[in-house]
């Protein structure tokens, strides 16, 4: 996905390079800002009542299905690039991500509290894609975004995310994700 790849590459360059080419970073940031979804409430709105749109989608022309994973990467890239210049996009993206946090403190990729496991027993559900439960990888990316923005454990969303990740750690010390 150009959105994911651009956000990830931009953030990596900014993290690793103390003097990146400002023209290149500005061009990438502006391209990302143009793709922020600010006016479409997709299926995610059914479980996220009152949350304003503000995310980014993995694919082009997929305004009804933005995802928190891409959004977190883009917000981190914009924040690292120029937090003042891109403050509106950053704030709206972070607001949307916080609004998409599930009751257990984690984040799914596209939805809130989409854990109706009985749906997995429907015969046409053999591929297991009817649910979008919170996962460690997506939740960790959202937590990283919030930490980069200066939110610590005293922030309610951060505390809930830390709790979710602690509860989800495997006995062997690892975490299991779904997307990355």
Model features per residue range: what roles?
Residues 1-180:
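Preference for long, amphipathic alpha-helical scaffolds in soluble/luminal domains
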